[in-house]
Amino acid sequence: MKFGEWHWDETGAPKDGAIVITVDIKAQVMSVFRGGWEIGTAVVLYGAGATPTPLGVFHITQKDADHHSNIYGGAPMPYMMRLTNDGVSIHGDLVADGWATHGCVGVPTPFAKKLFGIAKLGDRVIVTNGETLGVGQPIKAA
């Protein structure tokens, strides 16, 4: 996939079931699963340098469709889903080559809107740097 690309297809997926979101920093890809079925994927931006995106298992703790950063000069963060107490979030962004965030996971805004519509407080977000799990291996908390 290229920068700015995303796909969303719920065909055949269960109508309910746990939402699990995975982010692979190395591949620069987010995948969204519902009831074990992948329903969405997008190319992501991530934090680099002094503000890297943290790795680990997080839960969505806050949602705000029209959020603006209180740390970075009121920068728009549409469809924000907070992961950490210090502000790391998933949010809509212009996903372009050479861009980065201040630690957040940026996804194309139309994709963020779809994700925001199905994600609930407490849903799990797993952020890795190229790690994979075999069948039956547990997901370890950060």
Regions found by a protein language model. Name each.
Residues 1-52:
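Cell wall/extracellular polymer interaction/catalysis modules
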